[in-house]
């Protein structure tokens, strides 16, 4: 493994880990950064599956206590049964739309201009949602109804557009639908588990021929890096939301999106081949 390839794997692992669970779009950042450092082609598709799986395993580890409690109580406790049902209900819309439109979206929308526009629009919506007066009816994830779960699941489908952000769509959706900031964030993390594992399994099977033994060192660098930085990001976000709003992330999205559009408009960076991941 050449040092440059290892460096690319490290950088993309850091980007995936830091951005997957922040409301700033990991896919959008991956498209932009991968293009800037020249990491693309067939191997990149397999690599992305690996680092996304690492990120979700970091969340599973971080919430292992809650997961164990739910699994233990599922046969007999109504609260655990309702929580599990809500996750399945929220997961369902993404499954349906993902199977129907994933390839089409990847072909037509995976490019930096779409990412930039989605970042800006999402940032504006996030600012509006944060400044809007909230009527909270679900302080904790266990207070959610199946209707809350379904609405958040539908909001998650917006994240199929790169640059939107899966966590951003579900968290802001949760706030708009009456969840507290803590409940919306935690449910977003839990919903990420079946959603991302399902996506990884589907993509892994689809691109199974792209996994080659000679790429294992590259995958290992990306996996470890993504896992570590995802865990750090999740812990930091859970502490951050205790005393802060999501406005800082919204302004970052807007600034980053406008920067991408400016580099495209003034031909400072050639984005013509970007998104081929």
UniProtKB/Swiss-Prot annotation:
Segments passing through the bilayer: 47-67, 85-105, 108-128, 183-203, 218-238, 249-269
| Pfam families named among the record's database cross-references | BacA
Protein's membrane topology: Multi-pass membrane protein
Q: Which reaction does it catalyse?
A: di-trans,octa-cis-undecaprenyl diphosphate + H2O = di-trans,octa-cis-undecaprenyl phosphate + phosphate + H(+)
Q: Which molecular-function annotation in GO is an example for this chain?
A: undecaprenyl-diphosphatase activity
Q: Which GO terms describe its cellular component?
A: plasma membrane
Per UniProt, the keywords (alphabetical) are: Antibiotic resistance, Cell inner membrane, Cell membrane, Cell shape, Cell wall biogenesis/degradation, Hydrolase, Membrane, Peptidoglycan synthesis, Transmembrane, Transmembrane helix
Identify its protein family.
Belongs to the UppP family.
* Further comment found in the protein's record: Bacitracin is thought to be involved in the inhibition of peptidoglycan synthesis by sequestering undecaprenyl diphosphate, thereby reducing the pool of lipid carrier available.
Per the entry, what this protein does is: Catalyzes the dephosphorylation of undecaprenyl diphosphate (UPP). Confers resistance to bacitracin.
| Name of this chain's protein | Undecaprenyl-diphosphatase
What species was this sequence derived from? Pseudomonas aeruginosa (strain LESB58)
Gene assigned in the entry? uppP
